[in-house]
């Protein structure tokens, strides 16, 4: 079966042929490759072609595909039961690993997706603050719950407008949209809605408008505003937690959040996410408090076992993030040099094992900046790299990831492919 045939078959039964829209290659053109299996740093499609994978399941696989330790933990757990629907010491073990690492987190609760984590964190934050207003930032993605699917309408101080079909305006009326890395836009919302804002949520390292880190000064001023107006600050680290560093984004800004959300890496590739923070807020959750949150598969033993194996392996390797960042910098430096040689302007960014690039002549600080990137050039580059066996994120507004299964030789392979690709698309 060819990739085209497999994708055509998928479209008969699955909307758009995919279970998450970006996988359909809509923004880069062509049809997606259909994956048969994966191992280490590589994907293999149904036609037998091999790809160096810089997506790594959109971030979770920090050790690459089929890591032996995580694989063995999952297999062992399956033999003891895939789900109990009851408490298990494995939940406590993973919770302790995370709380011990992140000192601002007193307690944590597990869920099955990043969307659940952010949705639940916002609910308990509102329950604690007793105010409904929520500030989010343009370009930050916090999952697909209704209240967070908004874009800027007539400015940062107005109510948000739904940016997805099926989202009633009443659902987003308490969501206010601010500009990333622009503290004045946040001040204006607080000043104009002094008694309404109970929650602020932000990706400290945004990964869904490309890779765009928040400035240290901006985050510190955001913390001060939340304290001044009595709002709960949530740092969404579903992507950056245990990815940008062992402490997520914290070493880059040293700002303490009230709540933090996690996902991806903490599950070792399984469907695990979490939200945690100060005990006085987390104790508002049922059964101790009045804020209800639940999940059939939350904390299931297979996922917990994978997470324990992943975090334990991270903690046992003091040089892990040094190696990963070195490879990420080598890749982005290689892309810059290759683009320069072809007369193409590119901006790059690295945070630990995360990387991103924009085809623009200015530094990207927010969503409007990101939108000015040359997405047509990005699409051509993606197609040219895919043809050469390099699997990059099929959207300008996503982030790439390095895994520990990659070697310097793998990075050299990608850089050499980029040299050829840039010359091809420039011709």
Curated annotation (Swiss-Prot):
Its cofactor is pyridoxal 5'-phosphate. GO terms for biological process: protoporphyrinogen IX biosynthetic process. GO terms for cellular component: cytoplasm. Its main location: cytoplasm. It catalyses: (S)-4-amino-5-oxopentanoate = 5-aminolevulinate. It comes from the Bacteria. SUPFAM superfamilies: PLP-dependent transferases. Pathway: Porphyrin-containing compound metabolism; protoporphyrin-IX biosynthesis; 5-aminolevulinate from L-glutamyl-tRNA(Glu): step 2/2. Its EC number is 5.4.3.8. This is Glutamate-1-semialdehyde 2,1-aminomutase. It comes from Campylobacter concisus (strain 13826). The lineage of its organism: Bacteria, Pseudomonadati, Campylobacterota, Epsilonproteobacteria, Campylobacterales.
